[in-house]
Structure formats: structure tokens, C-alpha cells
Regions:
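SAM-dependent methyltransferase catalytic region
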Residues: 1-211, 215
Length: 215
């Protein structure tokens, strides 16, 4: 609403609070922020629930985002697909909660796009996975074809990520994951030594490590 104050969307938002009167210097700063927000596209909005449970907040956010997309001229069908791909993200330590949230979000998407389940769609809700079961000795088999500098950098970063995700289900949303070179890590994991018959799936006993997809 900061970027589009004349929009009538807030009439449908029960808990929306009007902005209070501000000091002149604060008001000037807010005006600058509104100019930046006015250039935002609906796809630029990001919302994450780091302890999503069954996905209730994400489902509510889906409806709000749908109103924003429609006000920008999108059809419900296109908006539903875009919301899944660009706008909402969720995490939880419980695998069962993840399953419920995934189902809830996809059913909400289907409410607006009946064909959403027929194609390949990215739903950015995940269960946090621990790195405890990953055999780090197998990391030496990855990075085939990469030069030594890139390979060593990727291995160092991946080991740092594995350290962070040790006992991750105990820490959940308080985890602080550093900013890594995800493109480098994806290439490192994908470039496996086929002669060694090792893949990231075989390096872990329960589940494979999923690196973030490109937004």
C-alpha cells in the first residue's frame, strides 16, 4: 500500500491499519520509500513463514497476493502460478507439517487455477533437513571437471553449510544460514565423478541435501 496509496485493496483487509501522523522528517523519508515501492511488480513481493506449521499464514497470504495481482491486471490463472513461483516461502522442522502446508498451498492455488496440478510447478515450502547423516568423506567425489580453485571453494562452502545444518531440526527457525554461492554449489553437486558411482543421494542415508532453486 505504501507504493499505491490510492488502491482500494485495503477495503478488503480486515486488519489493515492506516498510517499514523509522522514528524516532517519521517514523512519525507517515507515519501522516498513510497517512490521505490511504486515501481515494484507483484512478482517482487516476497513472504516467508520460517515456522509455517500447516501453512495457515501462507494460505491467507495467497488470497491477499491474489488481490494484488488482480489489481495489477493479472488473470487468476496466471497469478496463481506466479504466486507459487515468486512470492511465498515456508519452512518447518516437522516433515508432517511440511506435507500439510504443501497440500494446503497447492489446494489454494487450484482454487484459482484448476489446471495447476497438471503441470510442473514450484511450491517453495520445505521441511528443514539435518546434515547429520551426510557422509562428508564422499564430498571428494564431487566437482568433477571443475578447476581446483572452484572445487576447493565449493567444498569449503558446502562443509560450512553442513555445519550449520547439524541438528537443524532442534534449532529450526533460529538457524542463521550464511549467504553462499549457490550457483557454485549446484554445479559442484551436479558434477559428480561417474567413475566413482557416487551421487548426493548415496552420500546420505535418509534424504538428500536440497540446495535453493533460482528465484
Amino acid at each position: 500500500m505504501e507504493g499505491h496509496p490510492d488502491c482500494d485493496l485495503k477495503e478488503n483487509w480486515k486488519y489493515y491499519l492506516e498510517e499514523a501522523q509522522q514528524e516532517p522528517e519521517v514523512q519525507a523519508k517515507l515519501s522516498e520509500i513510497r517512490k521505490e515501492y511504486a515501481a515494484l511488480n507483484p512478482e517482487d513481493i516476497k513472504l516467508i513463514d520460517p515456522c509455517m506449521g500447516s501453512g495457515h499464514i501462507l494460505v491467507y497470504a495467497f488470497d491477499v497476493l491474489m488481490q494484488i495481482y488482480e489489481s495489477a491486471g493479472y488473470s487468476q490463472r496466471d497469478a496463481a502460478k506466479s504466486i507459487l513461483e515468486h512470492n511465498i516461502y515456508g519452512l518447518d522442522i516437522d516433515d508432517r507439517a511440511y506435507q500439510l502446508a504443501y497440500f494446503a498451498v497447492m489446494m489454494k492455488a487450484r482454487q484459482y487455477n484448476r489446471r495447476i496440478l497438471n503441470g510442473e510447478n514450484t511450491c517453495h515450502v520445505y521441511a528443514i533437513q539435518e546434515s547429520n547423516s551426510i557422509n562428508r568423506a564422499h564430498l571428494k567425489y564431487f566437482g568433477a571437471g571443475m578447476d581446483d580453485i572452484e572445487k576447493n571453494a565449493a567444498k569449503m562452502q558446502l562443509e560450512g553449510l553442513l555445519d550449520t545444518l547439524t541438528d537443524a531440526k532442534e534449532y529450526g527457525s533460529i538457524l542463521n544460514v550464511e549467504s553462499y554461492n549457490w550457483d557454485l554449489l549446484r554445479r559442484f553437486v551436479a558434477a559428480e565423478d561417474t567413475a566413482g558411482q557416487i551421487s548426493m543421494d548415496s552420500a546420505v542415508s535418509y534424504t538428500h541435501l536440497t540446495l535453493p532453486t533460482k528465484a
